[in-house]
Swiss-Prot record:
Organism expressing this protein natively: Listeria monocytogenes serotype 4a (strain HCC23)
Protein name, per record: Tagatose 1,6-diphosphate aldolase
EC number, UniProt record: 4.1.2.40
Similarity annotation: Belongs to the aldolase LacD family.
Protein biosynthesis as UniProt keyword: no
Stored PANTHER family: SULFOFRUCTOSEPHOSPHATE ALDOLASE
UniProt keyword annotations, A-Z: Lactose metabolism, Lyase
Pathway: Carbohydrate metabolism; D-tagatose 6-phosphate degradation; D-glyceraldehyde 3-phosphate and glycerone phosphate from D-tagatose 6-phosphate: step 2/2
Lyase is among the record's keywords: yes
Reaction catalysed by this enzyme: D-tagatofuranose 1,6-bisphosphate = D-glyceraldehyde 3-phosphate + dihydroxyacetone phosphate
Any one Gene Ontology molecular-function term assigned to this protein's record: 6-deoxy-6-sulfofructose-1-phosphate aldolase activity
InterPro entries: Aldolase_TIM, DeoC/FbaB/LacD_aldolase, LacD_aldolase, Tag_1.6-dipho_adolase
Biological process, per Gene Ontology: 6-sulfoquinovose(1-) catabolic process; D-tagatose 6-phosphate catabolic process; lactose catabolic process via tagatose-6-phosphate
Length: 338
């Protein structure tokens, strides 16, 4: 039996499909999306970013239980989403200050959990870069930061989705073989830390614990893990988390993310869905940049739709309801916030 306050429960239900699985689309990218559109189009314009997000939301949210957006460029997309699609809202500033050690997080100054809720948000999402092996003086700042967010979300009774992105302060190339060998331990450490009740996290938005580019049978070159080792890392991460968790696509291709989810399904990992971003819509940027709105709309109605609906089928086969970590749906006791 677990007690969940009504606001958090209602938010989680609005973000989930009829099976309790979070089949969500992510397009809260800001700086990176702006650069991608600028490269494809040759010009920089805030409206281009807004329009791209709006078209993605309009065309793809009929196939998603929820969408993750920002309020900087995403307001038109929020209004354009399908009526049955829930809304997660980003609270953190994009990127980090590269002149300061530790990739420290920061919040959007004119936003709060209350304002996110007032704007129709069903959950607050925070991304934090995390290296469990960095000095305590850096990580304690991040811990206190997340404790404050958790308290704020509890106060206004809205779900808190935390996205810890792991890194190594010394191995700076996150796509390297060297980092691939470190990644499983980093992801496990982030799960152990941020599952603690002090943070008030409701759902963990996790990286998969391996880089599939280096998994035997998937790798084209060097190998960091056998398939059995990769499976063990998936299973250990699943067992470590007392909280519901979903996977993020982390900028990989649609094909690679589908293979990743198939792998999780084959090994009975207890994940409760995905927040899939670039894997779904990134190939549409070039179409938008070179051919405009109508061409992007057509791409979204064909390839974009195929990307998301084929992923939905995989979730249908393997994802478990968000309440599975607590037992059955009947084991979730909904209480009014005091």
């Amino acid at each position: 039996m677990v007690q969940i306050t009504k606001g958090k429960f209602d938010g989680l239900q609005r973000l989930s499909n009829e099976k309790g699985v979070i089949a969500a689309l992510a397009i809260d990218q800001r700086g990176s999306l702006k650069k991608m559109i600028q490269q494809a189009k040759g010009t920089e314009n805030k409206k281009d970013v807004e329009d791209f997000k709006q078209l993605v939301s309009e065309e793809l949210t009929p196939y998603a239980s929820a969408i993750l957006l920002d309020l900087e460029y995403g307001t038109p997309a929020i209004k354009a989403r399908h009526e049955g699609s829930g809304l997660l809202t980003s609270y953190e500033k994009t990127g980090y200050d590269a002149t300061t050690p530790g990739k420290l997080p920061d919040l959007i100054e004119d936003l709060s959990a209350l304002r996110i809720k007032e704007n129709g948000g069903d959950a607050v999402k925070i991304l934090v870069y995390y290296d469990p092996d960095e000095p305590a003086e850096i990580n304690e700042i991040k811990y206190a930061f997340l404790e404050r967010i958790g308290a704020e979300c509890r106060a206004v009774d809205i779900p808190f989705f935390l996205e810890p992105i792991t890194y190594d302060a010394k191995v700076t190339d996150s796509g390297s073989l060297e980092y691939a060998k470190l990644k499983p331990a980093k992801v496990k450490a982030s799960i152990k830390e941020f599952s603690k009740p002090r943070y008030g996290v409701d759902v963990l938005k996790l990286e998969v614990p391996v880089n599939f580019k280096y998994v035997e049978g998937f790798a084209e070159g060097e190998v960091a893990y056998t398939q059995d080792e990769a499976a063990r890392h998936f299973e250990e991460c699943s067992d470590l988390s007392p909280l519901p968790f979903i996977y993020l696509s982390a900028g990989v291709t649609s094909e690679m993310f589908h293979k990743t989810i198939q792998f999780a399904n084959q090994h009975n990992v207890q994940y409760s869905g995905v927040l899939c971003g670039r894997a779904t819509w990134a190939d549409g940027i070039e179409v938008y940049g070179k051919q405009g709105d109508d061409a992007l709309r057509e791409w979204l109605r064909t390839q974009g739709k195929e990307n998301i609906t084929s992923l939905d089928k995989l979730l249908d086969e393997g994802a478990v309801p968000w309440w599975t970590k607590y037992g059955s749906f009947e084991d979730v006791h909904v209480v009014e916030k005091q």
